[in-house]
Amino acid sequence: KMNFAYGGDEFFIIFYQSPTFLTYEGVQITSGNSENYTIQSLEGGNFTNNFDECKKMKTSVEKELVDLFPNLKVVYQEERKHWSDPSGLSKTITTNILFGKTYDEAGIIRINCTDWSEKIEKEKGWNDNFRVIMNSKIFNIFLLSLES
């Protein structure tokens, strides 16, 4: 079954969890809803209930990626309210590694921690998480349109 996300049928999500995964508890694939089913985003993530520990994981992975891609633009974002929570109680912190000069020019790697409010966790069944995300240019432009 395809899980269409973001209130439309442009993209769908497939989520896998397995005890055999070594690094991440789950992997999420986002694909365009076309004949080719091109992967537009690939994520690895872990569930966490400790935002401070999540930020430590984020810092560690971000250092590895910055060392791996020293010539790419890195944008460190401050901790902020998560745009998906209208109450403003959920928070997120992200580091973006851009494969171009701007967010809409090329693909991106995002290293992210999200601390959902108790209300969001109960209502939507979402969990606090740490994620490493690779987005295509197409999907990144789509996400930018949701945030504006």
Task: Outline where the language-model segments fall.
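N-terminal leader/targeting segments
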Residues: 1-36, 145-148
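Non-cytosolic coordination micro-motifs
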Residues: 1-9, 41-148
